[in-house]
Design a protein with these regions (language model features):
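Beta-propeller domains with acidic blade repeats across secreted/periplasmic ectodomains
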Residues: 1-158
């Protein structure tokens, strides 16, 4: 957590809020709770005693499709106007059957669905007006150049 933000940025101070997360790559703050996309799950962090550090790491949505391959991360974290969360999984060379996918997690964390597939090593997501999603992907076997895609549900982008 950072404090001391002013026009000069001369007195910034950092404080660790959480440690030990499994390769976190995305973050959202919703209703003063921090949500983190990790390699194995979407975690909601709770500061139970208000001391500025997370005391409880809630498994908000466990990922059932985890690979040990070094590119197999869950990237970014976006939220739509209905409270649903989205992250994107890398896919090329992973040991999973799912070929790199945008995952939609319901607002209560109980339902995970595949939005779209075909991403090698995505390195960013965005959400536009009307809940339109974008994903940038790195080049690779499926794609000869890096690109940004405006997503539609059910489409393969590789």
């Amino acid at each position: 957590i950072i404090s001391g933000i002013d026009a000069g940025l001369a007195k910034l101070q950092w404080q660790r809020f959480a440690a030990g997360l499994y390769e976190p790559f995305g973050l959202q703050v919703i209703d003063n709770k921090i949500y983190v996309t990790c390699k194995d799950r979407l975690t909601r962090l709770h500061d139970m005693n208000n001391d500025g550090e997370a005391d409880f790491y809630e498994s908000f949505s466990a990922d059932t499709d985890v690979s040990a391959f070094f590119h197999a991360y869950n990237f970014d974290l976006q939220r739509d106007s209905k409270g649903n969360l989205y992250y994107v999984k890398a896919g090329q060379y992973t040991s999973r059957a799912l070929p790199g996918a945008v995952i939609k997690v319901s607002a209560n964390g109980k339902k995970r669905t595949v939005h779209s597939t075909g991403f090698r090593t995505p390195n960013g997501m965005g959400i536009l007006p009307n809940n339109r999603l974008t994903v940038s992907d790195n080049q690779g076997s499926w794609m000869p150049a890096s690109k940004v895609s405006l997503l539609k549900p059910g489409v393969f982008y590789g």
